[in-house]
């Protein structure tokens, strides 16, 4: 099975030895994204600003791979403070178009950032290349 790493200019920089995303077949697996800019600085002070930053990072990575954030089939959410769930839920419903992805939301009080999201996106098939002689 082929695996292709995706590097997305403009998304938050990986904080360790991992890729923004990896494409395997027609699926794109996006690593956990926090509310950081491309220099690694925390974006915003409110939960709403953090939400926008995290979803924007997912969208940047999806586009860099040739995909679309609205093709997410699975979304994992990790919330430092679970009292933010309703705001997260409402924002997701506004940012993404139906049909909405399968989703898991887990409270992680020791996360150290307000929210982290990871995602799996269904990608358009790659163009088939003719065999070389």
What is each model feature region?
Residues 1-56, 60-73, 79-133:
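N-terminal presequence-like segments and the immediate start of the first folded domain
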